[in-house]
Amino acid sequence: MVKSAASQSPSPVTITVTPCKGSGDRSLGLTSPIPRASVITNQNSPLSSRATRRTSISSGNRRSNGDEGRYCSMSVEDLTAETTNSECVLSYTVHIPPTPDHQTVFASQESEEDEMLKGNSNQKSFLSGTIFTGGFKSVTRGHVIDCSMDRADPEKKSGQICWLKGCDEKVVHGRCECGFRICRDCYFDCITSGGGNCPGCKEPYRDINDDPETEEEDEEDEAKPLPQMGESKLDKRLSVVKSFKAQNQAGDFDHTRWLFETKGTYGYGNAVWPKDGYGIGSGGGGNGYETPPEFGERSKRPLTRKVSVSAAIISPYRLLIALRLVALGLFLTWRVRHPNREAMWLWGMSTTCELWFALSWLLDQLPKLCPVNRLTDLGVLKERFESPNLRNPKGRSDLPGIDVFVSTADPEKEPPLVTANTILSILAVDYPVEKLACYLSDDGGALLTFEALAQTASFASTWVPFCRKHNIEPRNPEAYFGQKRNFLKNKVRLDFVRERRRVKREYDEFKVRINSLPEAIRRRSDAYNVHEELRAKKKQMEMMMGNNPQETVIVPKATWMSDGSHWPGTWSSGETDNSRGDHAGIIQAMLAPPNAEPVYGAEADAENLIDTTDVDIRLPMLVYVSREKRPGYDHNKKAGAMNALVRTSAIMSNGPFILNLDCDHYIYNSMALREGMCFMLDRGGDRICYVQFPQRFEGIDPNDRYANHNTVFFDVSMRALDGLQGPMYVGTGCIFRRTALYGFSPPRATEHHGWLGRRKVKISLRRPKAMMKKDDEVSLPINGEYNEEENDDGDIESLLLPKRFGNSNSFVASIPVAEYQGRLIQDLQGKGKNSRPAGSLAVPREPLDAATVAEAISVISCFYEDKTEWGKRVGWIYGSVTEDVVTGYRMHNRGWRSIYCVTKRDAFRGTAPINLTDRLHQVLRWATGSVEIFFSRNNAIFATRRMKFLQRVAYFNVGMYPFTSLFLIVYCILPAISLFSGQFIVQSLDITFLIYLLSITLTLCMLSLLEIKWSGITLHEWWRNEQFWVIGGTSAHPAAVLQGLLKVIAGVDISFTLTSKSSAPEDGDDEFADLYVVKWSFLMVPPLTIMMVNMIAIAVGLARTLYSPFPQWSKLVGGVFFSFWVLCHLYPFAKGLMGRRGRVPTIVFVWSGLLSIIVSLLWVYINPPSGKQDYMQFQFP
C-alpha cells in the first residue's frame, strides 16, 4: 500500500481485489496484511534472521466470550499451521473526499502508526495477562488472567491525555514540535480562539504531517548502517581538506574534519588549520595543515585502565615470598635431619603435617604475585554509545542488551520480600530500559513467589520513576528506607520530602501485602477446595438418586489462583503433576517489553503518587519462569535452572550479555551494569567471557565473628587472579558474554608452551575445524556461517548444532544474533576485523508475541536437554555442587579471560548466614564441591595449554584445599599429645629451631601486612579469616572430604539443604538475634573435641611439671604455647556455643572444670612422675 506523506486520510476504505492461499505473509492485525518490515537493510546481518524465524498467534486463538478461567490450547504446531494457511489479500486504500454526508474529521481517524501502536499495546496487555504452561506430553496452553494487581491505566500513567488543565480527553498525536500533548477539541479551540499558538511553547502551530521533510527525518531515525568510507561518494560541490592521520582513516565520518574551505579566521570553523596553529601548540612538532586538533579525542579514549600495584609495595612483597620459601626449605630440611629419637611417632606426624602446610601455602601464595587494579570511565561510555553521531543522529542508546537472571527455589527459606526488593533494584537500574530484561527463576514453582512478583511489578510503577527522578541510591526500597543517615543530603528538588513520604507509605502497604500473601493463598485455597468438595458430593448424590453413597469423595487439595483457577505449579498438598518435583513449565511476562521511545508521566493526582511529567516511566521487561520438572529426570539443581533461563531469554529477549544474581543480592550501585559493560566493550573486550564483581554483605555483626565478609578472598585472592587470566566465577554478581556460555571459544587465544608456560603462541579460533575431537571446544563462527558457508566445515558445524543445543530452531537462530550484538564497534576493531558498525543497535527491539513465548515453553521442558551438550560443554556445567567454579574453569580452559571489577561504590550487596551452624553448612557445601572437582576431569592438572600456569595453580588449589583439613586436625591435637606424653616434636628447643621458627613467623607477618597494604583490608579482617580457616578446617572440611570420597568410591549422592536467607528485621527486633542461636550439628564435634582435649592437656601438663621433682619446663612451654595457639583460633567457635552474652550456661563451666580436674588427677595417678614421694600418693577410698 502506497501512502503519500502530504495527503490526508480522513476515511480510508480497504478494497479486497484478489485472495491468495499459502503466501506465508504474516497478519499484524491491521487493515492490510502486509509482511513485517525490518529496519535492518543488510540481508547478511544476523539481526534480520530473527524476523524471519518468528510466528505469531492469530487473534482468533483467544476466546472472546470473557471466560477467563478457561484454558485456550495454543500448541506450536497449531500456530505454525494457522500461520502458513492464512489467507493473503491484495488490498489498497481509496480516500473518499469530504461531502455533505461525509464530513472530514481531522483527528477522528487514527493514523496507521497509531493503529500499529494500539496493536502493540493490545499485544502487550495480552502477554502480561497470560500464563503460558506446557511440558512433557502436554500441549502449550495460554491461560488468560488479570495478573496486574489493579495496575493503573497505562494511557493515564504515560500521560496520553490532554495536558490542559480540566481536560482528560485522549491525545491523538502531538501538534507541536515542543511535544506538548493536546486533544482534538482543545487543538481546535487554540486554532480558532487562541491565535493559533501552542499552549506549551507559545509558538504558532505548524502541521507536522504537512512537512515534506518528516518522512525523511523518520528514515534517518532508523540509524541504518552506512557503507564504509572508502566506498562512499563525496559531494562534488564541496571542496574538502582531508586529514592524513592514519588513526582516523578507518573511523566514522567526522564532521569537524570535512568542512568548507575558507581563508577567514573564524576559530574552529575553518577547514584549513594554519601552520602556526593560531598560536596554540606551536612550540613543537610543527603543527601545520596535517595536524588539526582532535575534537573527538575524548570518544577515542579507552573505557578502562589497568593500574598496577605500586612497586614500592609489590617488590618487597615478592621478595618476602622468596625469602619465606627459602626459610621454609631450610626449616623442613633441619626438621627431617634432626628427628626426635625419644618420640619418633610424634616427630613423624608433625613433620608430615609441616611438609603439607608448606605445599599448601606455596599453592596459595604463587597466584598472588601479580595483583592489579582497574578503573572505568563512564563518561567515555556515554559519549561513545549514547551520543548523537552520523549513524545515530538521535543519540539513541547503542549499548547491547543485558538479561538479568534472579534465581530462587523455596519461598519459605528465601522470603518473597527479599526477592521483591532485589527485583525492584534491577528494574530501577541506570541502564537503557529497552535494553534490559529481568527473569525470575522459581525452581519451586510456588504460587507465593508468582503473586509476590505480580505485586512487585505493580509497585515498580511507583518506585522506579521515584528513583529516576531523585537519583535514589541504593534502589532497593528496604535498604534505602532503612538507612540511618540524613536522607536530605544532596537533594535539591522541593517536592522530594513530600514524594518520599508518599512512596514510603506505599512501600509499607506493599510490605503488608507481600507478608499477608501466604495466609491469603491458604484461605483462598481452603475456600475453593471446600466448594469443590461440596460440588463433588452434590454430584455424587445426584448420581446415586438420593441413596447413601458407599464411597468417600476424594477431592485433591489444590492451590488456587486469584481468578478461581488451579495453579499449574506446586500445590501445598503435593499432588501428582503438582508437586515440587513434578509440575509443568510456566512462563508469565509480568511486564511486557517497553517501547523504544521514552514515555513521560503525568502530574501527581489520586492515581499518581508523584509528579512524573519529566520522568521516563517505562519499565524493563519482567518475566516469571518455572521450568518443568517430572519424576525420572535429573534437574541438576541451580545449574539446570540457570540453563533453562539461558534458553528462555535467548528466545524472548536475546541479550548478548547476562547478569546472574542470587535472590538476596541486590544492585547497590545503579551504575554497576555500565561499569561492567566498559570492560566488555573496550578494546580487547571480545576476549572477555565474564566480569565478576566482589560480593559485599549486609547484616553482619560488627565483629564479623565467622569471617562472613570474606574480604581476604574477595580483595586479595581475586584481585591477584585479575592480574593473571582473571578471577573465578563465584556464583552471583557476574556479567557473562552469552556466546561464552554457549561453549564457544574466544576469537583469539594464547597457548603456553615450554617450562612453566613461558613460551606463548597466539592462535586465532574464529574458523571452525572440520576434524575435531570429541572433547574439543567449539569455535565461534562468523555471522552467517551456519547457512552461507559452502565448504564442508560449515556443513559439519550445522549438523552438530541440534546435538549441541537442542532441536529448537528459534534458539539456534538466536545464536548469531547474540554474537553480532556483542561485537565491538568498528572504531575499536577496525574495518577488516570482526566488528559491527556504530549505531547498529540503536534500533527498536522486535515486539514480543505469544508464539515466541510458546516457543520458550518448549525449551524449558524436562526432556529438552536429553542427548545434548547442555551441562557438559554448554551453559552452567553439571556434576558438582559448586557449579559456578566449574563453569568459570571451563571458560578459562578454552582461552577466555575474565575481569574483576571493584567499583568505588559497592556494585551489589547481599546477605550471609551469621549463625554458626548455617555458616558451617555453607562452608561444607563449598568444600564438598571442591572435592568433587579434584576427583573429576575438571581438575586443573588436565587443563589445556590455553590456561596460564599460575591460573592453573590457583584452580588446582581450589580442588585441593579441603584435604589440608586432615593434616590440620592432626596438628591441632599434637600439642595435647605432647603435653599428655611429656614429649615434644623436637628433642629439645635448640637455638637453630627457634631461629627458623622465628624467621618463618616474621616473614608471614610481614607478608600479611603488605597484603593488607595493597588490598585495602584491615588487620582485624585478616585475623578473623585466619581464625575461621582453623574452624572450618577442623569441622566442615574433613566432613567434605569424607562425603566426596563416598561419592567417588561408593557412588553415594550428596544433597544439601538450601541456605536460609534472613528477612529484614522489624522495628524493635534484634538485628543479630540469629547470631546467638545455638543449633546443634555433627560438624561441631571435631572442633569441640580439640578444644576440650587441649584444655585438659594444659591442666595435665601443668600438674605433671609442678609435681615433678625434675620439671622439664622447655617441653611444657612448647606444648602450652602451641595449645594456646589452637585455642586462640577456636575462640569464635567457643563464643558461638555460649549463646547470647550474659546468658552463658553456668553448667558448661562447672562440667568443664570438673572434667578437667578429674582427667588431670587420673593421668597423674595412672602415670605418676618419677621420683614421687609418699605424701604425694593418692588413693581412692
Curated annotation (Swiss-Prot):
UniProt keyword annotation of Transferase present:
yes
Specify residue ranges for compositional bias: Polar residues.
Answer: 1-17
Q: Where is the active site?
A: D443, D884
Q: What happens when the gene is disrupted?
A: Significant reduction of root and stem growth, xylan reduction in stem and increased susceptibility to the cellulose synthase inhibitor isoxaben.
**Residues passing through the membrane, by range:** 312-332, 343-363, 966-986, 991-1011, 1038-1058, 1082-1102, 1116-1136, 1146-1166
Q: Which Gene3D superfamilies match?
A: Spore Coat Polysaccharide Biosynthesis Protein SpsA, Chain A, Zinc/RING finger domain, C3HC4 (zinc finger)
Annotated compartments? Golgi apparatus membrane
InterPro entries per record: Cellulose_synth, Nucleotide-diphossugar_trans, Znf_RING/FYVE/PHD
E.C. no: 2.4.1.-
Q: Which residues form a coiled coil?
A: 497-542
Annotated Gene Ontology MF terms?
cellulose synthase (UDP-forming) activity; glucosyltransferase activity; mannan synthase activity
**Biased composition, class Low complexity, residue ranges:** 48-59
Residues of the region (Disordered) are 1-70, 202-229
How does this chain sit within the bilayer?
Multi-pass membrane protein
Q: Pfam families from the xrefs? A: Cellulose_synt, zf-RING_4
| Leading EC class | transferase
Q: In which tissues is it expressed?
A: Expressed in vascular tissues.
Supply one GO CC term from the record.
Golgi membrane
The answer on whether this UniProt entry bears the keyword Coiled coil reads yes
Q: What does this protein do?
A: Involved in stem and root growth. Possesses xylan and homogalacturonan synthase activity.
Q: Which family does it belong to?
A: Belongs to the glycosyltransferase 2 family. Plant cellulose synthase-like D subfamily.
Which protein, by its recorded name, is this?
Cellulose synthase-like protein D5
Taxonomic source organism: Arabidopsis thaliana (Mouse-ear cress)
